[in-house]
Amino acid sequence: MKLFGTSGIRMKNLDPLIAYKVGFAISKNFKKAVIGRDTRTTGNLIESAITAGLLNGGCDVTTIGMVPTPVLGYSARDYDLGIMITASHNPPEYNGIKLFNKNGTAFDPKQEEKLEKIIANDDFNEGTWDNIGCASEDKTAVKKYSEYILQNVDIKTNFNVVVDCANAAGCVVSPNIFTEAGCKVISVNSHCDGRFVGRMPEPNETNLKETVDIIKGLNSNGRNYIGIAHDGDADRMIAIDELGRVTDFDKLLAAFCKYVVQKTGADKIVTTVDASMAIDEYLDEFGAKVIRTKIGDVAVAEELEKTGAIFGGEPSGTWIHRDIHLTPDGILSGLRVLEMMEFYGKKLCDIIDEVPSYYNMREKIACPDNLKQKVMDYISKEGKKIFEKEPETLDGVRFSFEKGWMLIRPSGTESYVRVRVEAKDEDFAEKLMENGISMVKTGISEN
């Protein structure tokens, strides 16, 4: 059974035996590990199991308790690797394991494949009494992380901020760090509860309805509150503007990319193949290059290291600030949105409204997993004939045009092929989507 997916191990009712085996496999090549966990009810169970495997294999283990992923990623610099027990935005019955290198980057597919081979081939009975690792606890991780982040943000304005932590790991950091940064903070869903009683951890418009209503109520008297909302492990964030609008992920990313280039003079930024062409349009004005990479924080971090770009972000709200660290950080990202507002001297709603609006369409077509590659091969060849141009095949199949683009990509976690279209006019968007759906369905039927 394949364990690692697009973001570590993540599954419903994660078996502690799997966690034990992962820990034991890690101990083959690493001798000093740090472990953090989010608020899920199975967190202690999975932490204990993976710790047992590590100790049995002779790896020393330090636990730092309930923390967001950015805290774990920052802490990893003092160890051989970091282990985060989280299922991110998934419902409470899920849990997972995500591994981080010493530099804060998540394990890449080659590293995960190496672990999978060890797990598949090992008997897990090699531990002996004279080669057991040492276990310890560090209660200072949150303090160290918070101090480091606050040293590297510069906010002089006393912003009004509603922080929504989803009863998840962000609770132990975000309300305090925004307060220490000088903000007037109202915290929502800010007590830790692995059942996510306030809202589900995916920070989307549906789940954030109550938080939006709170902000609208506060701002009815001209208070100008904005919202910062996290997912289950706070490696992501989304903002809610003063009008109570959950900001479009693409628009917020485009606005922030422009800010980074204007403030720092950066000549390039990194984003993914599914990000809006508004980024290209914005940065072209400043002569900055947009480097696109595969979807996922691993690919973004790798490209940041390779190119020396200062910032990389995905339209999912996963942003990496290389000048601070290489772990996706929704807490730092929220603070830097405030820096952006201060830099421009504008409300967030006005900054967002300046970003070009395009027509976006998304569809998903059911496709058996064993046909996905054949379907993508068909789309690549057929699309070349239809559009009379070479496709981009970095991640899925993408066709770019002057007026828009289309990305067709197989889901890494579900039996679907997804079609994403963005265009400057509605007719062109609909035409692209029709072609995309037709190619996917034909590719399935002919294979």
Curated annotation (Swiss-Prot):
Q: What does it catalyze?
A: alpha-D-glucosamine 1-phosphate = D-glucosamine 6-phosphate
Does Transmembrane show up as a keyword for this record? no
Which residues does the Swiss-Prot or TrEMBL record annotate as the active site?
Answer: S88
Q: What is its EC number?
A: 5.4.2.10
InterPro entries in the record, alphabetically? A-D-PHexomutase_a/b/a-I, A-D-PHexomutase_a/b/a-I/II/III, A-D-PHexomutase_a/b/a-II, A-D-PHexomutase_a/b/a-III, A-D-PHexomutase_C, A-D-PHexomutase_C_sf, A-D-PHexomutase_CS, Alpha-D-phosphohexomutase_SF
What cofactor requirement does the entry state? Mg(2+)
- Tell me the Gene Ontology biological-process terms attached to this UniProt entry: carbohydrate metabolic process
Mark the residues carrying the PTM Phosphoserine.
Answer: S88
Free-text description of this protein's post-translational modifications in UniProt: Activated by phosphorylation.
Q: Which UniProt key words apply to this protein?
A: Isomerase, Magnesium, Metal-binding, Phosphoprotein
Domain of life of the native organism: Archaea
Annotated cofactor note: Binds 1 Mg(2+) ion per subunit.
MF GO annotations: magnesium ion binding; phosphoglucosamine mutase activity
**EC top class, as a word:** isomerase
The record lists Mg(2+) as bound by S88, D231, D233, D235
Q: Which PANTHER family match?
A: PHOSPHOMANNOMUTASE
Family membership: Belongs to the phosphohexose mutase family.
Role played: Catalyzes the conversion of glucosamine-6-phosphate to glucosamine-1-phosphate.
Which protein are we looking at? Phosphoglucosamine mutase
Organism of origin is Methanococcus maripaludis (strain C7 / ATCC BAA-1331)
Phylogenetic lineage? Archaea, Methanobacteriati, Methanobacteriota, Methanomada group, Methanococci
